């Protein structure tokens, strides 16, 4: 009963800032669906691509934000969250992944990447130049991902070693999360002992537009990336016994 009351109080407090700021940025021309595996958990992401702007987000986060901010559907989300908490110690797979609450926007026209993120109950906007990892391409190492022939590339990027597979048939310098800068779209990525990402589908028709999502009308504070990482790693910010998922970036 206490758990139910807490969830209701939390969700209703968010409804006080029910969003009006969500807006379309531009039409999309392609959407890549990615499936991620982290420990015993999974998530599903979209890389939605327009002419100038692409966005990367968790489908499950988008659904939670959309339904949770709607007074007509918020109770369904509350019940889902309660069941998830009750099943937390069971061996069932959970919907969970590093930085799953983030919305990332990559603007190729101005060369900037913007990340909308949070640390506990504070919300931040990080703007940086589009990252350019130093890739080593392994021409002799290939694999097929959803029917596309892909070439392997490796890099050490922001504290983690990444191995990715990119497809030159789709000549876009994009990929999941902040991975990109190769002569083809990244369709799979692996960080040993941390995370697996693999494309599950590519959509080309009847696509939603590239959209700035802010259903809760959150007020984001500008912060630089390194200050954010320092703040996010501060254990005093979080309540006791909070289970923390490692961040995508370590440095």
Regions found by a protein language model. Give the residues of each.
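Extended soluble regions of mature proteins
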Residues: 21-251
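Bacterial Sec-dependent N-terminal signal peptides
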Residues: 1-27
